[in-house]
């Protein structure tokens, strides 16, 4: 179990990085979270068309394209894959939220996304 305090102070988790100051779920947001003293970062993952775990909150990118239908190499420029995000969050804990809701465009009834996250995080 993880302690909710660190050196006598509550642990701070940055939701999608420092998303008030930088674009959410980006390397800049994670770096700013570290600068601001975050202990943890929460981020969201979805599967791309070519099976890469991409860090994005919604089922669609901001430009309207569905994450599940876009190859990782064609994602918006500041979009990270999970491996890149974990590297950007080095030194902080990471809470990976798997977006897998029934009724959403990218719902994964076979839990392949969960298995992929577990495989990458456990590596």
Model-derived features with residue positions:
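Phosphate-group recognition and catalysis centered on beta-loop-alpha active-site segments
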Residues: 1-123
């Amino acid at each position: 179990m993880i302690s909710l305090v660190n050196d006598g102070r509550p642990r701070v988790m940055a939701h999608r990085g420092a998303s008030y100051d930088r674009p959410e779920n980006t390397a800049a947001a994670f770096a700013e979270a570290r600068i601001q003293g975050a202990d943890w970062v929460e981020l969201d993952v979805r599967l791309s068309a070519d099976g890469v775990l991409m860090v994005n909150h919604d089922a669609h990118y901001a430009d309207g394209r569905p994450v599940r239908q876009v190859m990782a190499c064609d994602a918006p420029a500041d979009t990270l894959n999970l491996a890149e995000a974990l590297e950007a969050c080095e030194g902080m804990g990471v809470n990976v939220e798997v977006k897998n809701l029934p009724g959403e465009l990218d719902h994964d009834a076979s839990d392949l996304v969960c298995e992929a996250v577990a495989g990458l995080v456990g590596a």
